């Protein structure tokens, strides 16, 4: 199957400038293509993974990827379908974030070996060497204001107000494509569907300035079956950086994907063949309660992003927490699995009576409730049920002399951190 047709089969092609011409180009030889990543945070997130993995699929098919870090455009801020203008970051912050993004991309694209090894570029390298006058003369003259205002991403901001800085963003992204086309023979740009207006500014500039032929292909912005924007957990982005979203949290995210989305996401986010995914679909529909599709998703994506060791650790944390076996996990694993639960910092020398502790830490609202919970066996310390109303937290309860884990009922966890 032609790589373009496989991408369509996987639901990864949203829009193209010329589908037949692009398919033919991908069939006839190696195509140089690029995807841009503005450093708007210190990590990429799951939303970026669609374009990243699409880029990797093309590389595996023999095409050559260019990964563009937007050191210049990141200083400006893309207005596409944003309700308000982005806060401008300092150069130092953008450089720092850009360096982190470089490291993350190297986990997915092959930068070291092969004729089609990936190339990393930064648009700050060319924008920092062009004067404002030259940019207006050599680039700005190819764009009419009517053309720029016709972009849907701009139309949505006209009534509420858009700064010239953001208005000019599409020309900057268009110039990126022109620079890569001129210097590296890059003829294809890949990006999210919200980038269509900015991306086609590049094909227009290449056509008008050098009479060249270039292509754009957008990948869809992924939503779940309810229409909710994909890639967020409890309203927060699921980051690729393990310090921002732990492998365990990412594992749980995929494990909790709805049945209606699971098989579709296998096509988008894994490198399993379409035949393998079809086999999983059949088994999944026969026994959805076994959650084969979600478990496969979690295994494939966590391993891809963080490695097999992190995946196995996430599985172990999940199993031990489900069984209530707190002592079967290291403090490092517990902190990963219990990130986000209420924490209470205490002095090491404190003698903490269980009743007072439950109230002051907010586990329960009153001493009466605390006594009831302890008497009824609803309170656990490091997995052990506590029914002694006079119980006091001791050195023996400090795991690795660092934390104590309290559980109320089956699911409500609380962590004591000792200073």
UniProtKB/Swiss-Prot annotation:
Any one of the GO BP annotations: tyrosyl-tRNA aminoacylation
Catalytic activity as recorded in UniProt: tRNA(Tyr) + L-tyrosine + ATP = L-tyrosyl-tRNA(Tyr) + AMP + diphosphate + H(+)
EC numbers, comma separated: 6.1.1.1
Family statement: Belongs to the class-I aminoacyl-tRNA synthetase family. TyrS type 1 subfamily.
Organism from which the protein derives: Streptococcus agalactiae serotype III (strain NEM316)
Single GO term (MF): ATP binding
Function: Catalyzes the attachment of tyrosine to tRNA(Tyr) in a two-step reaction: tyrosine is first activated by ATP to form Tyr-AMP and then transferred to the acceptor end of tRNA(Tyr).
Keywords tagged on the record: Aminoacyl-tRNA synthetase, ATP-binding, Cytoplasm, Ligase, Nucleotide-binding, Protein biosynthesis, RNA-binding
Signal sequence, start to end: none
Cellular location(s): Cytoplasm
Gene3D superfamilies: HUPs, RNA-binding S4 domain, Tyrosyl-Transfer RNA Synthetase
Gene Ontology CC entries for this record: cytosol
Protein name (record): Tyrosine--tRNA ligase
Enzyme class: ligase
